[in-house]
């Protein structure tokens, strides 16, 4: 089966105050830190106003949300990746998860079993649907939800066959799953990063 890596970078970053994808941490943009966990061949889904900025940074495969679902959140981003690329399994990652490790993403990919539509980790009791693997066969379900403007990803998970994985069972540190939504989250990055080094 053909595998596609997808980085979602289309959020408005309202709570953060500026586009999170391009915020520098330890000399790299946050999206670059997340992308490292996916590998070199990565498709980026973003907002129209960010496309040029990604391309100026050397990213070649960058798309905006497919019509008619522009600006409709992560589900639109996943749908767009399905529509724009030729793949079967899609590793999906949000750009504001800079501490996620490549080994964790590879373990999730390894755990995709026959018949499952998705592999989704759970860390500290929290389901992590934007650090996950999805099969393209869910595309009609995605289309229906987007058409109905049902944008909660939890609704999607309730309609497909999901293999849930406890993060500790694949050797993942809870710190990997930090999601940068606010400046306070960003200020905690160093501490969380240090806990990864001690692991």
From Swiss-Prot:
Database matches in Pfam families: NTP_transf_3
MF-aspect GO terms: GTP binding; metal ion binding; molybdenum cofactor guanylyltransferase activity; nucleotidyltransferase activity
CDD domains linked: MobA
Residues reported in the UniProt entry to bind GTP: 8-10, 20, 65, 96
Catalytic reaction annotation: Mo-molybdopterin + GTP + H(+) = Mo-molybdopterin guanine dinucleotide + diphosphate
Organism, as annotated: Bacillus subtilis (strain 168)
Chief site of localization: cytoplasm
Gene Ontology CC annotation, any one: cytoplasm
Sequence similarity: Belongs to the MobA family.
Domain of life from the UniProt record: Bacteria
This protein's name: Probable molybdenum cofactor guanylyltransferase
InterPro entries per UniProt: MobA-like_NTP_Trfase, Molybde_CF_guanTrfase, Nucleotide-diphossugar_trans
Amino-acid positions noted as binding Mg(2+) in the UniProt annotation, renumbered to this chain: 96
Compartments it resides in: Cytoplasm
Function: Transfers a GMP moiety from GTP to Mo-molybdopterin (Mo-MPT) cofactor (Moco or molybdenum cofactor) to form Mo-molybdopterin guanine dinucleotide (Mo-MGD) cofactor.
Gene3D superfamilies, sorted: Spore Coat Polysaccharide Biosynthesis Protein SpsA, Chain A
Domain comment as written in the entry: The N-terminal domain determines nucleotide recognition and specific binding, while the C-terminal domain determines the specific binding to the target protein.
Annotated GO biological process: Mo-molybdopterin cofactor biosynthetic process
